[in-house]
Amino acid sequence: MQDLINYFLNYPEALKKLKNKEACLIGFDVQETETIIKAYNDYYLADPITRQWGD
């Protein structure tokens, strides 16, 4: 997941296309892609002190 976050940070236009459903991640269907984007948003928008991935 960290690799995906780094990719989104380096290529924000790719994230924009994913959010607009103009693209999807290879190997993931649209629903899985939406789940990944939600996880990214939840992580990225979280307070840096409380940022952590699930156990």
Swiss-Prot record:
Effect of substituting residue 47 to A: Induction of srfA is delayed approximately 1 generation
Origin species: Bacillus subtilis (strain 168)
Consequence when changing residue 51 to A: Induction of srfA is delayed by 2 generations or more
PTM note: Trp-53 is modified by farnesylation, which is essential for activity. Modified by the tryptophan prenyltransferase ComQ before export to the extracellular environment. The type of isoprenyl derivative differs among the different pherotypes and depends on ComX primary sequence.
Note: The DNA sequences encoding comQ, comX and the N-terminal two-thirds of comP show a striking polymorphism, which determines the specificity of the quorum-sensing system in the different pherotypes of Bacillus. In ComX, the sole conserved residue is the modified tryptophan essential for the activity.
Pro-peptide region(s): 1-45
Variant or mutagenesis effect after changing residue 50 to A: No change in activity
Lipid tethering residues (3'-farnesyl-2',N2-cyclotryptophan): 53
Protein name, per record: ComX pheromone
GO MF, one annotated term: pheromone activity
Summary of the function given for this chain in its UniProt record: Part of a major quorum-sensing system that regulates the development of genetic competence. Acts through the activation of the two-component regulatory system ComP/ComA composed of a sensor histidine kinase, ComP, and a response regulator, ComA. Activation of ComA leads to the direct regulation of over 20 genes and expression of over 150 additional genes, including those involved in competence development, appears to be controlled indirectly. Under certain conditions plays a role in sporulation.
